[in-house]
Protein backbone atom coordinates (compact mmCIF):
# COMPACT_ATOMS: atom_id res chain seq x y z
CA UNK A 1 0.00 0.00 0.00
CA UNK A 2 1.22 3.47 -0.81
CA UNK A 3 2.16 5.73 2.08
CA UNK A 4 0.17 8.85 2.91
CA UNK A 5 1.42 11.92 1.09
CA UNK A 6 -0.08 14.56 3.34
CA UNK A 7 1.83 17.51 4.76
CA UNK A 8 3.49 18.52 1.53
CA UNK A 9 3.10 21.92 -0.10
CA UNK A 10 0.70 22.77 -2.93
CA UNK A 11 2.36 23.34 -6.28
CA UNK A 12 1.03 26.24 -8.33
CA UNK A 13 1.62 27.65 -11.79
CA UNK A 14 0.68 26.87 -15.36
CA UNK A 15 2.10 24.66 -18.09
CA UNK A 16 5.88 24.65 -18.28
CA UNK A 17 8.24 23.60 -21.04
CA UNK A 18 10.22 20.39 -21.37
CA UNK A 19 8.42 18.17 -18.85
CA UNK A 20 10.08 14.83 -18.20
CA UNK A 21 8.55 11.36 -18.12
CA UNK A 22 6.87 9.90 -15.05
CA UNK A 23 8.01 6.68 -13.40
CA UNK A 24 5.86 4.19 -15.30
CA UNK A 25 6.69 0.50 -15.58
CA UNK A 26 4.84 -1.84 -17.92
CA UNK A 27 3.51 -4.96 -16.20
CA UNK A 28 1.38 -6.72 -18.82
CA UNK A 29 -0.99 -6.21 -21.74
CA UNK A 30 -4.37 -7.84 -22.32
CA UNK A 31 -4.74 -8.18 -26.08
CA UNK A 32 -7.88 -8.22 -28.24
CA UNK A 33 -9.81 -6.11 -25.75
CA UNK A 34 -11.21 -2.74 -26.77
CA UNK A 35 -11.34 -0.11 -24.02
CA UNK A 36 -12.34 3.47 -24.88
CA UNK A 37 -13.13 4.52 -21.28
CA UNK A 38 -12.18 2.89 -17.99
CA UNK A 39 -12.75 3.69 -14.31
CA UNK A 40 -11.59 2.08 -11.07
CA UNK A 41 -14.32 1.18 -8.56
CA UNK A 42 -13.02 0.69 -5.02
CA UNK A 43 -16.37 -0.66 -3.79
CA UNK A 44 -16.22 -3.73 -6.04
CA UNK A 45 -12.44 -3.81 -6.41
CA UNK A 46 -12.62 -3.73 -10.18
CA UNK A 47 -12.29 -1.77 -13.40
CA UNK A 48 -15.35 -0.70 -15.40
CA UNK A 49 -14.79 -0.59 -19.15
CA UNK A 50 -16.77 1.02 -21.97
CA UNK A 51 -16.08 -0.10 -25.54
CA UNK A 52 -18.34 2.33 -27.42
CA UNK A 53 -21.20 -0.17 -27.54
CA UNK A 54 -24.35 -0.40 -25.42
CA UNK A 55 -22.51 -2.57 -22.87
CA UNK A 56 -20.10 -1.99 -20.03
CA UNK A 57 -17.79 -4.65 -18.62
CA UNK A 58 -16.45 -5.11 -15.09
CA UNK A 59 -12.94 -6.55 -14.83
CA UNK A 60 -10.99 -7.62 -11.78
CA UNK A 61 -7.85 -5.62 -11.07
CA UNK A 62 -5.97 -8.47 -12.77
CA UNK A 63 -8.02 -8.18 -15.97
CA UNK A 64 -10.50 -11.07 -15.54
CA UNK A 65 -14.04 -10.39 -16.75
CA UNK A 66 -16.50 -10.44 -13.84
CA UNK A 67 -19.68 -8.92 -15.23
CA UNK A 68 -21.16 -7.52 -18.44
CA UNK A 69 -24.52 -5.86 -19.03
CA UNK A 70 -26.58 -3.69 -21.37
CA UNK A 71 -26.74 -0.09 -20.14
CA UNK A 72 -29.80 0.94 -22.14
CA UNK A 73 -27.69 3.60 -23.86
CA UNK A 74 -26.99 2.95 -27.53
CA UNK A 75 -23.34 3.95 -27.26
CA UNK A 76 -21.30 4.45 -24.08
CA UNK A 77 -18.37 6.73 -24.87
CA UNK A 78 -17.21 7.52 -21.32
CA UNK A 79 -17.97 6.54 -17.74
CA UNK A 80 -17.06 7.27 -14.15
CA UNK A 81 -17.87 5.80 -10.74
CA UNK A 82 -20.23 7.39 -8.20
CA UNK A 83 -21.48 6.21 -4.80
CA UNK A 84 -24.56 4.42 -6.14
CA UNK A 85 -23.18 3.17 -9.43
CA UNK A 86 -21.95 4.62 -12.71
CA UNK A 87 -22.40 7.85 -14.62
CA UNK A 88 -22.23 7.10 -18.34
CA UNK A 89 -22.16 9.42 -21.37
CA UNK A 90 -22.73 8.85 -25.08
CA UNK A 91 -20.25 11.49 -26.26
CA UNK A 92 -23.00 13.70 -27.70
CA UNK A 93 -24.15 15.47 -24.56
CA UNK A 94 -26.42 12.82 -23.02
CA UNK A 95 -25.67 11.41 -19.56
CA UNK A 96 -27.36 8.68 -17.56
CA UNK A 97 -26.94 7.13 -14.10
CA UNK A 98 -27.14 3.36 -13.64
CA UNK A 99 -26.50 1.09 -10.68
CA UNK A 100 -23.82 -1.60 -10.63
CA UNK A 101 -26.25 -4.12 -12.13
CA UNK A 102 -27.13 -1.88 -15.06
CA UNK A 103 -30.52 -0.65 -13.82
CA UNK A 104 -31.38 2.98 -14.59
CA UNK A 105 -31.28 5.31 -11.58
CA UNK A 106 -32.71 8.33 -13.39
CA UNK A 107 -33.72 9.56 -16.83
CA UNK A 108 -31.15 10.75 -19.39
CA UNK A 109 -29.98 14.32 -18.78
CA UNK A 110 -27.35 16.90 -19.71
CA UNK A 111 -24.59 17.35 -17.14
CA UNK A 112 -23.76 20.79 -18.54
CA UNK A 113 -24.91 22.73 -21.58
CA UNK A 114 -21.27 23.26 -22.57
CA UNK A 115 -20.59 19.52 -23.00
CA UNK A 116 -21.09 18.01 -26.46
CA UNK A 117 -18.03 15.90 -27.25
CA UNK A 118 -17.23 14.23 -23.92
CA UNK A 119 -14.35 11.79 -24.38
CA UNK A 120 -13.32 11.24 -20.76
CA UNK A 121 -15.04 11.68 -17.42
CA UNK A 122 -13.95 11.41 -13.77
CA UNK A 123 -15.96 12.17 -10.64
CA UNK A 124 -13.60 13.89 -8.22
CA UNK A 125 -13.60 13.53 -4.45
CA UNK A 126 -15.51 16.79 -3.92
CA UNK A 127 -18.36 15.69 -6.19
CA UNK A 128 -17.35 17.80 -9.18
CA UNK A 129 -16.45 16.22 -12.52
CA UNK A 130 -13.22 16.38 -14.49
CA UNK A 131 -14.07 16.18 -18.19
CA UNK A 132 -11.96 16.10 -21.36
CA UNK A 133 -13.13 16.82 -24.89
CA UNK A 134 -11.14 16.86 -28.13
CA UNK A 135 -13.14 19.22 -30.36
CA UNK A 136 -11.96 21.65 -29.15
CA UNK A 137 -9.25 20.15 -26.98
CA UNK A 138 -10.09 21.12 -23.42
CA UNK A 139 -9.98 19.97 -19.81
CA UNK A 140 -12.83 21.16 -17.61
CA UNK A 141 -14.07 20.90 -14.07
CA UNK A 142 -17.87 20.85 -13.91
CA UNK A 143 -19.91 21.35 -10.73
CA UNK A 144 -22.82 18.94 -10.06
CA UNK A 145 -25.23 21.72 -11.11
CA UNK A 146 -23.46 22.08 -14.48
CA UNK A 147 -21.45 25.22 -13.69
CA UNK A 148 -18.05 25.33 -15.40
CA UNK A 149 -15.49 25.77 -12.60
CA UNK A 150 -12.35 25.43 -14.75
CA UNK A 151 -11.65 25.32 -18.48
CA UNK A 152 -8.16 24.75 -19.90
CA UNK A 153 -7.35 24.37 -23.60
CA UNK A 154 -4.98 21.50 -24.34
CA UNK A 155 -3.42 23.09 -27.41
CA UNK A 156 -1.96 25.75 -25.10
CA UNK A 157 -0.07 23.18 -23.04
CA UNK A 158 3.63 22.58 -23.60
CA UNK A 159 3.75 20.13 -25.28
CA UNK A 160 0.23 20.52 -26.69
CA UNK A 161 -2.41 18.02 -25.54
CA UNK A 162 -4.49 18.10 -28.71
CA UNK A 163 -6.54 14.88 -28.46
CA UNK A 164 -7.42 14.21 -24.79
CA UNK A 165 -9.48 11.03 -24.50
CA UNK A 166 -9.42 9.66 -20.95
CA UNK A 167 -8.98 11.20 -17.52
CA UNK A 168 -8.53 10.15 -13.89
CA UNK A 169 -6.97 11.58 -10.73
CA UNK A 170 -4.55 10.21 -8.15
CA UNK A 171 -6.01 10.99 -4.70
CA UNK A 172 -2.62 10.66 -3.00
CA UNK A 173 -0.62 13.14 -5.09
CA UNK A 174 -3.57 15.19 -6.37
CA UNK A 175 -2.29 14.86 -9.93
CA UNK A 176 -4.62 14.57 -12.91
CA UNK A 177 -3.81 11.91 -15.51
CA UNK A 178 -4.96 12.31 -19.11
CA UNK A 179 -4.25 10.16 -22.16
CA UNK A 180 -4.35 11.50 -25.70
CA UNK A 181 -4.65 9.31 -28.77
CA UNK A 182 -2.70 8.81 -31.98
CA UNK A 183 -4.02 12.02 -33.50
CA UNK A 184 -2.06 13.66 -30.69
CA UNK A 185 1.03 12.30 -28.92
CA UNK A 186 -0.40 8.92 -27.85
CA UNK A 187 0.93 9.75 -24.40
CA UNK A 188 0.07 9.98 -20.72
CA UNK A 189 -0.05 13.57 -19.47
CA UNK A 190 0.43 14.11 -15.73
CA UNK A 191 -0.96 17.48 -14.65
CA UNK A 192 -1.14 19.52 -11.46
CA UNK A 193 -4.70 20.48 -10.41
CA UNK A 194 -4.30 23.87 -12.15
CA UNK A 195 -3.17 22.30 -15.44
CA UNK A 196 0.58 22.66 -15.04
CA UNK A 197 2.25 19.90 -17.07
CA UNK A 198 4.34 17.71 -14.74
CA UNK A 199 5.28 14.89 -17.11
CA UNK A 200 4.47 13.38 -20.49
CA UNK A 201 5.05 9.65 -20.96
CA UNK A 202 4.94 8.20 -24.51
CA UNK A 203 2.76 5.08 -24.80
CA UNK A 204 3.31 3.95 -28.39
CA UNK A 205 5.59 1.07 -27.42
CA UNK A 206 2.71 -0.39 -25.38
CA UNK A 207 -0.25 0.19 -27.70
CA UNK A 208 -1.92 2.21 -30.43
CA UNK A 209 -4.52 4.94 -29.90
CA UNK A 210 -4.71 5.48 -26.11
CA UNK A 211 -8.25 6.42 -25.06
CA UNK A 212 -8.95 5.27 -21.49
CA UNK A 213 -7.08 5.62 -18.21
CA UNK A 214 -7.77 4.48 -14.65
CA UNK A 215 -5.75 4.20 -11.44
CA UNK A 216 -6.01 1.86 -8.46
CA UNK A 217 -4.61 4.40 -6.00
CA UNK A 218 -3.54 2.27 -3.05
CA UNK A 219 -1.26 0.15 -5.24
CA UNK A 220 -0.32 2.69 -7.91
CA UNK A 221 -1.59 0.32 -10.61
CA UNK A 222 -2.34 2.23 -13.80
CA UNK A 223 -4.60 0.95 -16.58
CA UNK A 224 -4.52 2.36 -20.12
CA UNK A 225 -7.05 1.33 -22.75
CA UNK A 226 -6.07 1.40 -26.42
CA UNK A 227 -8.92 1.73 -28.90
CA UNK A 228 -7.27 1.21 -32.30
CA UNK A 229 -4.79 -1.19 -30.71
CA UNK A 230 -7.55 -3.26 -29.07
CA UNK A 231 -5.63 -3.72 -25.81
CA UNK A 232 -5.58 -2.93 -22.10
CA UNK A 233 -2.11 -2.27 -20.69
CA UNK A 234 -1.33 -2.46 -16.97
CA UNK A 235 1.51 -0.48 -15.37
CA UNK A 236 3.08 0.41 -12.05
CA UNK A 237 3.03 4.20 -11.76
CA UNK A 238 4.69 6.68 -9.39
CA UNK A 239 3.72 10.39 -9.39
CA UNK A 240 6.31 12.94 -10.44
CA UNK A 241 5.54 15.23 -7.51
CA UNK A 242 2.88 15.93 -4.90
CA UNK A 243 0.53 18.83 -5.58
CA UNK A 244 -1.89 18.73 -2.62
CA UNK A 245 -1.41 19.06 1.12
CA UNK A 246 -3.79 16.27 2.18
CA UNK A 247 -4.76 13.11 0.28
CA UNK A 248 -8.27 13.06 -1.17
CA UNK A 249 -11.00 10.59 -0.23
CA UNK A 250 -10.49 7.45 -2.32
CA UNK A 251 -12.89 4.80 -0.99
CA UNK A 252 -12.05 1.47 0.71
CA UNK A 253 -8.88 -0.51 0.12
CA UNK A 254 -9.20 -3.34 -2.37
CA UNK A 255 -9.17 -6.61 -0.44
CA UNK A 256 -7.95 -8.61 -3.44
CA UNK A 257 -4.88 -6.58 -4.46
Provide a role label for each language-model segment.
Residues 23-30, 64-70, 104-111, 148-159, ...:
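A short beta-strand motif characteristic of beta-propeller blades
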Residues 31, 40-42, 47-53, 87-93, ...:
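Conserved beta-strand positions in repeat-built beta-propeller and related beta-rich domains
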Residues 31-44, 72-83, 112-126, 157-174, ...:
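Beta-rich, blade/repeat-based domains predominating
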Residues 51-62:
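Beta-propeller domains
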Residues 55-57, 94-97, 138-141, 187-189, ...:
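A short loop-to-beta-strand structural motif that recurs across blades of beta-propeller domains
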Residues 60-64, 99-103, 143-147, 191-196, ...:
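Short loop/turn segments that connect beta-strands within beta-propeller blades
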Residues 212-257:
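Blade-level signature of beta-propeller repeat domains, shared across WD40, Kelch, NHL, RCC1
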Amino acid sequence: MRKSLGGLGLAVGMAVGNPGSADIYHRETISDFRAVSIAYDALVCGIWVANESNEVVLLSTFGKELRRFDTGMRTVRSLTVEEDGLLIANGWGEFRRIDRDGRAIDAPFRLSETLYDTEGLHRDADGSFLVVEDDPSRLMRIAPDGTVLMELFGDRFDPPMTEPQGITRDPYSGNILVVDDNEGLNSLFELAPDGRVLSVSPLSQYGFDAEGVALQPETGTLYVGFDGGQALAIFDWIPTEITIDTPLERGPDCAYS
